[in-house]
Amino acid sequence: MAKKVQAYVKLQVAAGMANPSPPVGPALGQQGVNIMEFCKAFNAKTESIEKGLPIPVVITVYSDRSFTFVTKTPPAAVLLKKAAGIKSGSGVPNKDKVGKVTSAQVREIAETKAADMTGSDVDAMMRSIEGTAHSMGLVVEG
């Protein structure tokens, strides 16, 4: 018989840097999950990813306090900031442009995010990423 799902917990945790401090500890502690077991498993799964990159994770907690988790790709905004070499987006994206990204970089980000995005093809996903770039005050060249 399948296990009964108790809760879904969605978090963003830095790759390879999960530890019992907030936000991981309180979110999983409320569900009665072994926090250190999750931290070790998450860090092992994300060791190949650049350390410190925020990784969205969906943790499924079962009624017997066991869990499974699925990692997603980093948010598009984080990948765009990294590609443009900036710390943060523009506070006024329509007026202040804070950086530039090329179409090749946008395509690379779209291909990276392909597993998590619902776009039917790479061009549709690129348009979505370009929209995110524009809302951050980035100029897409090419």
Curated annotation (Swiss-Prot):
Keywords: Methylation, Ribonucleoprotein, Ribosomal protein, RNA-binding, rRNA-binding. Disulfide bonds: none annotated. One or more lysine residues are methylated. SUPFAM superfamilies: Ribosomal L11/L12e N-terminal domain (SSF54747), Ribosomal protein L11, C-terminal domain (SSF46906). GO terms for biological process: translation. One of its GO terms (cellular component) is cytosolic large ribosomal subunit. GO terms for molecular function: large ribosomal subunit rRNA binding; structural constituent of ribosome. HAMAP family: Ribosomal_uL11. This is Large ribosomal subunit protein uL11. The gene is rplK.
